[in-house]
């Protein structure tokens, strides 16, 4: 059994178990948040309830101690996202992790066509996950195959889109809000949405705003968490 590192007495609540809401910054991985928390608290038993891609921001639920047993429960909750889809091009990763290609004219695309296209992506649908994803096929994560140029047959997966609302259109950019089931890839939704319009599309920004009843408005910034931990340690040291 891995030995728990020495930790500051004020970190006992984190050792026992906490549920912390973070607002993940742009370009941080979800595991970067875990590493930061482990470094600050010296608590090893830490996990998050649902990966956010590096180019996404927003709500990340992090659990410590006994609450790591509830991670699967949090992961199963419905999610809400806001973001933008850029029409008229595609990318291999379905987002801006790779360069846009297949540039297409939008001269025949109207706001009404964009609004009408949401109907086919609402309700229970079969969704093809991106090749650049952590899903495993025959024991190998898909992104390894994608990076090596290997062609892998992927099976579509059932997901549910409870709401798909277009909030603003300024072509080529379409702003949206989505409420969906766990397992939904918003990158795939963006790619499929562009394909349905016949012009291609990719996810150009994404923010997770809700997980179940948890909201990003209640989440903590990384700097605020660091200051909070420093204050806890300082208060305890003063009393000792």
Predicted regions and their residues:
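Catalytic/RNA-binding core of pseudouridine synthases
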Residues: 1-240
């Amino acid at each position: 059994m891995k030995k728990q590192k020495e930790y500051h007495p004020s970190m006992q609540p984190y050792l026992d178990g906490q549920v912390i809401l973070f607002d993940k910054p742009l370009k941080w991985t979800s595991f970067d948040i875990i590493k930061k928390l482990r470094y600050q608290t010296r608590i090893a038993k830490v996990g998050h309830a649902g990966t956010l891609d590096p180019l996404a921001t927003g709500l990340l639920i992090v659990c410590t101690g006994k609450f790591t047993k509830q991670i699967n429960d949090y992961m199963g909750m419905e999610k809400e996202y806001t973001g933008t889809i850029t029409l008229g091009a595609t990318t291999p990763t379905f987002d801006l992790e790779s360069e846009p290609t297949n540039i297409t004219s939008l001269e025949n695309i109207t706001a009404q066509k964009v609004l009408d296209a949401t109907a086919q992506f609402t309700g229970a649908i079969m969704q093809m996950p991106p090749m650049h994803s952590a899903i495993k096929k025959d024991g190998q994560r898909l992104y390894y195959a994608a990076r090596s140029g290997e062609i892998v047959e992927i099976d579509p997966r059932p997901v549910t889109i409870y709401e798909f609302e277009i909030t603003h259109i300024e072509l080529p950019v379409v702003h949206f809000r989505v409420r969906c089931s766990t397992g939904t890839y918003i990158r795939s939704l963006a790619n499929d949405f562009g394909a349905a319009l016949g012009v291609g599309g990719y996810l150009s920004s994404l923010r997770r705003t809700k997980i179940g009843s948890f909201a990003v408005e209640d989440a903590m910034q990384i700097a605020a968490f660091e200051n909070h931990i420093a204050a806890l340690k300082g208060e305890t040291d003063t009393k000792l």
